[in-house]
Amino acid sequence: MKNKHSGFSGSLGFVLASAGSAVGVGNIWRFPYLCAKDGGGLFLLVYLVLVLTFGFTLLTTDVAIGRRTKQNALNAFGTLHKKWRFLGYLTFLVPTLIMTYYSVIGGWIAKYFAVYLVSDGTQAAQDGFFTSFITSQVSPIVFMLLFLALTAWVVYRGVEKGIEKYSRYIMPVLLLLVIGIAVFSLTLSHTDDSGVTRTGLQGLAFYLKPDFTGMTLRSFLNVVLDAMSQLFFSLSVSMGIMITYGSYVKDDVDLNKANGQIEIFDTGVAFLAGVMIIPSVYVFLGVDGMASGPSLTFISLPRVFASMGGVGRIVGIVFFLALGFAALTSCVSVMETLVANCMEIFHKSRKEMCAMVGVYSLVTAVTICLGYNVFYFELTLPNGSAAQLLDVMDYISNRYVVPVVMLILFLTSTGFWNLLFRH
């Protein structure tokens, strides 16, 4: 059957939906850690330069390809030129891999939100709570199912009535929640057992002040590489997502303006996440409390919330609600990309492809959940870290497939632009 091509109602819907895709858990649990690790303001400056140059070029290229071809990511490159068809398959591989585990992470967030909602949240700060949760065989699957069902419902509703409609509500609320916690974190003050008092403003200075201590050419290149990897992780480029969303954009939308707004929203939330997290962790745990990824979100921050006393529960609720919104909008964009591609591949309706992608997501996500117990193993990655099944899937997609596609896109961007705007 022939499917009518959906679309956003206008520029605002596209910007909010795309910002929702870009603003994910990586902005909140990875960006602040990299800032703390890589010299604070130095990392911010390097990242900003990359976003305004490299990132803007790739984002605009992705969206322009989608709008010009009105095709999903799988077919868009081949529509421009047969020799680039292979890029469509590479970009299709990325959301296929990410969808296997993103709803699992969403389930973790839902679990912690529920804990703070129904209790004072102190149990979340206890040693071993996170490990005990993810290694259980039932609870992670239940919360993953809830998150996946909500994601599938939004995608099933379609572009304008689902993705755009919910993004219009969720993204402003997400921004307000992040701003609220960021402002609150600056008011914090704590005196530890040794009598040392640390304040939120001192934590802000730690976050913003460039630290060149021990800086060498090699360490600076590491900062650049970290900033580049965060760029890959954050803007949703080279994953087929922005090509798919670009295919829904009306021809009268100013892409340069819209893409600039997306970058401002995405980078702004990442920056505010740093203001939200780094000062509060610094106040209660010091510099040594900084951690990356799940350790920061599900271990360090609950300890910070517990140290706040009664207000910690409220902050915990607001934080995990904001993180849940960020995870939901990103997961929706990943599933939408798969559904849009499958609608073209199999010539089936959105309803049928939502069901098929939903079953795929469910089976693979359950497998990922069981990777911490029934299918448990440890594999040493090239970077030396020990990885389970989720880590392996994330490593393959974000360390290999995405950078390769992004590099090819950047190197061939001149050719793409000649084809996109030839008369």
Where in the sequence are the language-model features?
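Membrane-embedded translocation segments of transport machinery
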Residues: 2-8, 168-328, 332, 352-353
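Hydrophobic transmembrane alpha-helices that form the core helical bundles
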Residues: 55-74, 84-129, 324-343, 403-404
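Loop-to-transmembrane helix boundary motifs in multi-pass membrane proteins
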Residues: 7, 13-14, 21, 137-142, ...
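Membrane-interface "cap" regions at the ends of multi-pass membrane proteins
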Residues: 1-29, 58-63, 67-79, 85-89, ...
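Membrane-water interface regions at transmembrane-helix termini and the short interhelical loops
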Residues: 34-38, 64, 79-80, 86-95, ...
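Extracellular loop-to-transmembrane helix junctions
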Residues: 6, 35-61, 139-140
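Inter-helical loop and helix-membrane interface segments of multi-pass membrane transporters/permeases
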Residues: 2-5, 34-38, 71-90, 103-162, ...
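Transmembrane helix-boundary motif of multi-pass solute transporters/channels
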Residues: 10-48, 241, 257-260, 264-267
